[in-house]
Amino acid sequence: MLSSCRAVTSMSRWSKHKKTKEVISMLSHNQKPNSWKILWRLIKSVQGRTSSKVLYVMVCAIFGILTGVTNSILLAQGLGFIFPTTNTETDGIQSVYLLVFAHNLPVMERLTIVCVTVVVAYILIFSFNVAQNYLGLKLYQEICALLRWKAYLKIQSMSTSFFDTQNNGDLMSRLTNDVYNINNLYAQVGGQTIQSLFILMTTATILFVLSPVIALISLTVLIALIALSFLFLKKARAAYAKVQNNLGDMSGYIEEVLSNHKVVHVLKLQEVMIDNFDKYNRPMVNPTIKANTYAVFIYSWFGFISNITYLASISIATAFSVNNIPSFGVSAINYSFMLSYIAALRQTALPLNQIFSLWNLIQLGIVSGERVFKILDLESPQKQATITKLPNIKGNIRFEKVVFGYSADKPILTGIDFSVKHGDIVAIVGPTGAGKSTIINLLMKFYKPFAGKIYMDNFEISEVSETAWREKISIVLQDPFLFSGTIKENIRMGRQDATDEEIIEACKVANAHDFIMRLPQGYNTFISNKTDYLSVGERQLLTIARAVIRNAPVLLLDEATSSIDVHSEKLIQQSIGRLMKDKTSFIISHRLSIIRNATLIIVINDGKVLEMGNHEQLMRQNGFYARLKRSAVK
């Protein structure tokens, strides 16, 4: 929980060059990613789902495609069936019509037969497309929910030091915006890709059946022109990557400012924050324009090469017909052949054209996939602990020559030694920056010391899992934090199996029961960290009740009574007094009344223990503690 001072410091870092942040970030782009590998991982994510669901989508897509292609050919050849030429020989699919239906039927009856056949095909196409879209969307939503859950799980498994170097807004953007882009890739492009593969195989087969020579020439021209498109794809992807990275930076800035809006208003920083926002907003413009320009160009380019391919095919077929060159296929080169061939060729180019029209979604999906996979590929802290469950702990705490710093080149604690017995009330005293909160952070196992050892009873901290270690510790921070939910649910966060009766008793111990009962819905009143009808003191009493229900043998109080009014302070001190009973308590506070009652005061400065003793002993020594207290009184 950040204090106001830390909030201002945190916001000020946005004014630094963002390159500094990229260097320290574990999610920064240190190497050029491979788009095909990312795309393959996205495909494997689909493959990893229930095979039957994937099969249903593919079956619907295949039948829809086959019906559509067949319908196009039936429609083209049906014209020849309706209006037969004087040639007694019939080619291609016209023969099918004549075999099924009498060739001597009147024109209107022939028209009816063709129309009914085509309408039935359209109904089948519609049915298969609806089924494919529904099943596909359901499948893709499940995949994205799984990706989002895995990414969130990975983030939750990371150590506290990970969050010291990460942009929270960027993490949120990866879990929301990037997963949304992946969903669009699956929903818009996934089904289209399945269709495209089978359309290409089906129509290519039809083209080669009609005329293998002309088909080979047409497809060669088409493939050669498509190959030129890949010259622009790398540039387009780089532009989209820049857009997403800038969006993550901007999201981080917005999250930081909005979460500290009170500090911004108190310090009248609105204009400064607006100017800083523009530094993140404006860089979004040019990369976005550039990325979309590439997408439009690629789409238009493919439309151009499709038309060139059609023209080339017609020219070649005409040349074959004029020079009496056989088609080497099942049909002679005539009017019906041209209709069938161009229809099949259009069906070949159409899915590719549709994919190129969605190229912006493809690039965004690949870039977003890379950003999400960077989270999934993070190495979780190594679980070296061999003890996953601690027995009943008394709460004896011992530091042995502990050395630690938030950066390797700047140690904050240098050889901390002290020993605390069960039931002691320990006050940690020192000037700002001496390392008081760092000791609390190490006790909570948020960080690993560079050197030295920390013991709880006879268990060394590195041998115990984080969960088992923290089960034995309760903490009350300077800034009370409330979860979104009812008061009862908030208190139960301290211990999930607590009964309603235990929650009420804990609130009575914490002096919170009376004001809770004055609320309209009592313990079922909905609150959140932004609730404004609870005072700071009342919010702190709720966090104390949460610590009471936890009933851990070690208690940490980090400035728990600062910024509290006199009436609330008395209630909080009473509740803390009850809470500390039969516990080993560590207190960080500037209030003399709280420090005076400590059984042991540890005085630290510049990362070292200078003095230890109770208040009277340290005052008689007339050392650093005595000078610190006299200066505080002045």
UniProtKB/Swiss-Prot annotation:
Binding site for ATP: 430-437
Residues covered by the ABC transmembrane type-1 domain: 54-364
SMART domains, A to Z: AAA (SM00382)
Ranges where the ABC transporter domain occurs: 397-631
TM annotation in the entry: 54-74, 111-131, 189-209, 213-233, 296-316, 325-345
Subcellular location(s) per record: Cell membrane
Membrane disposition: Multi-pass membrane protein
Any Pfam family matching the protein: ABC_membrane
Annotated keywords: ATP-binding, Cell membrane, Membrane, Nucleotide-binding, Transmembrane, Transmembrane helix, Transport
Keyword check for Cell membrane: yes
GO terms under cellular component: plasma membrane
GO terms, molecular function: ABC-type transporter activity; ATP binding; ATP hydrolysis activity; ATPase-coupled lipid transmembrane transporter activity
Family named by the database record: Belongs to the ABC transporter superfamily.
Protein name: Putative ABC transporter ATP-binding protein MG015 homolog
Species: Mycoplasma pneumoniae (strain ATCC 29342 / M129 / Subtype 1) (Mycoplasmoides pneumoniae)
Classification lineage: Bacteria, Bacillati, Mycoplasmatota, Mycoplasmoidales, Mycoplasmoidaceae
